[in-house]
Amino acid sequence: VLRWAHENGCPWRVDTCVYAAQNGHLEVLQWARANGCPWDERTCSMAAMAGHLEVLQWARTNGCPWDKRTCFGAACGGHLEVLQWARANGCKWNEETCSGVALGGNLELLQWARANGCEWIWDRCEAEAKANQHENVLAWLHKNKPTEP
């Protein structure tokens, strides 16, 4: 369908690569790129959010840009292996990564992020965990609440 649409004048949009990455369709992404389809940072962030490490790796190897939203996406999706790979390959992160983990509720991922120097805004993490009823994350947060200066 995509090939037919493109061959019949349907213009390329960045979203084509984003949706292919989000849904783990590596062959579609490869075909789209080979035929001139543009991409941007969202291609990597959506692959990460959905846990498609192979797609993310291919995108990066082939020059797709990424930013801190890639780590945030992996965090929200609860994909520790994806987050570890992104960080090992130079992807930036910030306090939003920990907020994303609290939103997604993966305690192991939150512990790994904090142990590896990811900044956080404790109150925001608590609010995300509470809003999404992640009791194990809340318990860990309360045990690890920063002391007031």
State where each predicted segment sits.
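Ankyrin repeat (ANK) tandem alpha-helical domains that serve as protein-protein interaction scaffolds
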Residues: V1-P149
